[in-house]
Amino acid sequence: MKTLRWFCAAALAVAVGVPSVRAQEPPKPGPEHEQLKKLEGTWEATMKYMGQESKGTMTYKMEVGGLWLTSNYEGDFAGAKFYGKGFDSYDAGKKKFVSVWVDSMITTPMFMEGTYDKEKHTLTMTGEGPSPAGPTKFKSVTHFVDDNNIQMDMYMGDAKDPGFTITYMRKK
């Protein structure tokens, strides 16, 4: 009984002594999120990798209060079904775009971050992800040709030429 009285007294002291806590105002989408929102929709994808070409479909959707662009990729790669999922946003604290990618060929996510060049309409991101040789540095350069066409080049390690290229064309 003495312990219960002590606990109640301590709880009352904390409740009276602590100013009321308000819910923090959630972040609101900024101009960078609006840039990502332009990608919403379904895109036909063509991937070129080591002389081979494969096709797929990428679907983008803004979610989580307009703060995250989710992407779902379905297609084929080297004759096998391939699935991928991405999460892209703008980190206002870092002042950088951020990305997480997972797919049916890896069990370790790829994390990337980078900046957007408004004049060149290009998003350049760097990060590290899995490869057959172990953790590898990656760089993606995504050029927004116009509202309906995108080209993404992915560089691995210190390569001067892209390891693969994906072109996207918005489905009408």
Sequence positions of predicted segments:
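Bacterial N-terminal signal peptides
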Residues: 8-17
